[in-house]
């Protein structure tokens, strides 16, 4: 019996439709299962990477030198301690290297991991040469980041707070500038095994955040990077160095030290305008200003380390102290000559009272009696000459006027000393010249940034 062609076509259409629907129904669950198994794929990749991995061995052991590329992002810089010669810095410290043992193939090109994986693989033993104390942040979890690319390149980032040494040369204090270094390198691997390089060009290898400065007495001018080799008893090591350039702000010290010193010197010179006979007033001026300068000198040194050399501020205070002390010595000199000498100005003359001349007559009972002995001549012979002498001897004596001498000019005190007149001009002039030379020298001087050779 022959089948109808229309029925057979219809049957084949139904079979194709059912097969298509069946295939879709079976395919949809398999795609969902694949998406759900991504975590399984990650786990399998990590397990395969760590299978037989020895984190005690550096990458390329026995074949090549391990290159570690680094860069730093500074989130906070400061404060800086002059007394301890150190500074504090908060950074994101990034290191990148290649480990062929960690190559993988999978649906992803980068594995984004945390600190748990970092503890299972080899990482550089980087330490800070001039670090006094370094802290890795652990709240709420260790602040570490790990990225592994499919070609085995790793990026390892951690957040650190480092308190590092900053050798300071304070000869120009407080107009000084410093280059505070941050030095790091491998602790155990010599340059024949591990070398460090900057990830980018020097200008971009170390970046400071715009709001990262935490400095009150300094301006952060910028930073420079460098690298070098340090020789030690165990070999040669690569050391990466970053210098942060600081310039001190002088405003605080002008208000706290310089202006009080200048005003004290000016106050000491006021005594030149007082009379040299004003001993108590001038003594108070001299002693008070000397004690004030002593107090200022002591307080200015409290915020600085005990260095064996004189700073620019020490020189200024010393000169001011010399001016104040010289003003006191000047008064002592004037007072010395005032007691032992007179200076006649030719104008002030005190008339001298007339001196009484001794009267040849003796005053007795309010009457004058001649001091000569009276005798009676013998007139018996009748000599007319003798009679005349006798007559004259009996005449009453007349009153004798005292002799007077013309008044002589008397020497008087001159209240203004020649030394005072000279000091009124010389002291302010010399102090002004000193200030002009001092400020012109230190403000226009280029700072000498010295950095000692690092050592291990």
Swiss-Prot record:
Residues 28-253, 302-311, 442-456 are extracellular. Keywords: Cell membrane, Chloride, Chloride channel, Cytoplasmic vesicle, Disease variant, Disulfide bond, Epilepsy, Glycoprotein, Ion channel, Ion transport, Ligand-gated ion channel, Membrane, Postsynaptic cell membrane, Receptor, Signal, Synapse, Transmembrane, Transmembrane helix, Transport. It is found in: Postsynaptic cell membrane; Cell membrane; Cytoplasmic vesicle membrane. Glycans are attached at residues 38, 138. GO terms for cellular component: chloride channel complex; cytoplasmic vesicle membrane; dendrite membrane; dendritic spine; GABA receptor complex; GABA-A receptor complex; GABA-ergic synapse; plasma membrane. Its main location: membrane. Residues 1-27 form the signal peptide. It catalyses: chloride(in) = chloride(out). One of its GO terms (biological process) is chloride transmembrane transport. Residues 275-279, 334-421 are cytoplasmic. 4-aminobutanoate binds at residues 94, 157. Pfam families: Neur_chan_LBD, Neur_chan_memb. It is a multi-pass membrane protein. InterPro entries: GABAA/Glycine_rcpt (IPR006028), GABAAa_rcpt (IPR001390), GABBAa1_rcpt (IPR005431), Gabra-1-6_TM (IPR047024), GABRA1_ECD (IPR047079), Neur_chan_lig-bd (IPR006202), Neur_chan_lig-bd_sf (IPR036734), Neur_channel (IPR006201). The chain crosses the membrane at residues 254-274, 280-301, 312-333, 422-441. Changing residue 269 to L: Reduced potentiation and activation by the agonist alphaxalone. GO terms for molecular function: GABA-A receptor activity; GABA-gated chloride ion channel activity; transmitter-gated monoatomic ion channel activity involved in regulation of postsynaptic membrane potential. Disulfide bonds join 166-180. Heteropentamer, formed by a combination of alpha (GABRA1-6), beta (GABRB1-3), gamma (GABRG1-3), delta (GABRD), epsilon (GABRE), rho (GABRR1-3), pi (GABRP) and theta (GABRQ) subunits, each subunit exhibiting distinct physiological and pharmacological properties. Interacts with UBQLN1. Interacts with TRAK1. Interacts with KIF21B. Identified in a complex of 720 kDa composed of LHFPL4, NLGN2, GABRA1, GABRB2, GABRG2 and GABRB3. Interacts with LHFPL4. Interacts with NLGN2. Interacts with SHISA7; interaction leads regulation of GABAAR trafficking, channel deactivation kinetics and pharmacology. Belongs to the ligand-gated ion channel (TC 1.A.9) family. Gamma-aminobutyric acid receptor (TC 1.A.9.5) subfamily. GABRA1 sub-subfamily. PANTHER family: NEUROTRANSMITTER GATED ION CHANNEL. Functions as a receptor for diazepines and various anesthetics, such as pentobarbital; these are bound at a separate allosteric effector binding site. NCBIfam families: LIC. It is linked to Epilepsy, childhood absence 4: A subtype of idiopathic generalized epilepsy characterized by an onset at age 6-7 years, frequent absence seizures (several per day) and bilateral, synchronous, symmetric 3-Hz spike waves on EEG. Tonic-clonic seizures often develop in adolescence. Absence seizures may either remit or persist into adulthood. Alpha subunit of the heteropentameric ligand-gated chloride channel gated by Gamma-aminobutyric acid (GABA), a major inhibitory neurotransmitter in the brain. GABA-gated chloride channels, also named GABA(A) receptors (GABAAR), consist of five subunits arranged around a central pore and contain GABA active binding site(s) located at the alpha and beta subunit interface(s). When activated by GABA, GABAARs selectively allow the flow of chloride anions across the cell membrane down their electrochemical gradient. Alpha-1/GABRA1-containing GABAARs are largely synaptic. This is Gamma-aminobutyric acid receptor subunit alpha-1. It comes from Homo sapiens (Human). The lineage of its organism: Eukaryota, Metazoa, Chordata, Craniata, Vertebrata.
């Amino acid at each position: 019996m022959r089948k109808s062609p229309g029925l057979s076509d219809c049957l084949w259409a139904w079979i194709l439709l059912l097969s298509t629907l069946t295939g879709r129904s079976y395919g949809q669950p398999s795609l969902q299962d694949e998406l759900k198994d991504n975590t399984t794929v990650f786990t399998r990749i990590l397990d395969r990477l760590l299978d037989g991995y020895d984190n005690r061995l550096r990458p390329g052991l026995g074949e090549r030198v391990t290159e570690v590329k680094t860069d730093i992002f500074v989130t906070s810089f400061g404060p800086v301690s002059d007394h301890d010669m150190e500074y504090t810095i908060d950074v994101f410290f990034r290191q990148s290297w290649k480990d062929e043992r960690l190559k993988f193939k999978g649906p992803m090109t980068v594995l984004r991991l945390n600190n748990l994986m970092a503890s299972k693989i080899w990482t550089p033993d980087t330490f800070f040469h001039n670090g006094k104390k370094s802290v890795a942040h652990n709240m709420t979890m260790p602040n570490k980041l790990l990225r592994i690319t499919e070609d085995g390149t790793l990026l390892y980032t951690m957040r650190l707070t480092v308190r590092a040494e900053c050798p300071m040369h304070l000869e120009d204090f407080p107009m000084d500038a410093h280059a505070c270094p941050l030095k790091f390198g491998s602790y155990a691997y010599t340059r024949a095994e591990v070398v460090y390089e900057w990830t980018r060009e020097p200008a971009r290898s170390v970046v400071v955040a715009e709001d990262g400065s935490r400095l009150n007495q300094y301006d952060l001018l910028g930073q420079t990077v460098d690298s070098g080799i340090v020789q030690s008893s165990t070999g040669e090591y690569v050391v990466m160095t970053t210098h942060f350039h600081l310039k001190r702000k002088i405003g605080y010290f002008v208000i706290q030290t310089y202006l009080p010193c200048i005003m004290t010197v000016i106050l000491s010179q006021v005594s030149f305008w007082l009379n040299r006979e004003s001993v108590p007033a001038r003594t108070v001026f001299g002693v008070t200003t000397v004690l004030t300068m002593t107090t200022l000198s002591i307080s200015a040194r409290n915020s600085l380390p005990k260095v064996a050399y004189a700073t620019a501020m020490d020189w200024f205070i010393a000169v001011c102290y010399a001016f104040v002390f010289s003003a006191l010595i000047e008064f002592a000199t004037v007072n010395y000559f005032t007691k032992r000498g007179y200076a006649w100005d030719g104008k002030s003359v005190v008339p001298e009272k007339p001196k009484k001349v001794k009267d040849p007559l003796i005053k007795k009972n309010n009457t004058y009696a001649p001091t000569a002995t009276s005798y009676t001549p013998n007139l018996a012979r009748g000599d007319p000459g003798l009679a005349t002498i006798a007559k004259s001897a009996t005449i009453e004596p007349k009153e004798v006027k005292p002799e007077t001498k013309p008044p002589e000019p008397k020497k008087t005190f001159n209240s203004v000393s020649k030394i005072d007149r000279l000091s009124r001009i010389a002291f302010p002039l010399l102090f002004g010249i000193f200030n002009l030379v001092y400020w012109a020298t230190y403000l226009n001087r280029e700072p000498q940034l010295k950095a000692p050779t690092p050592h291990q």
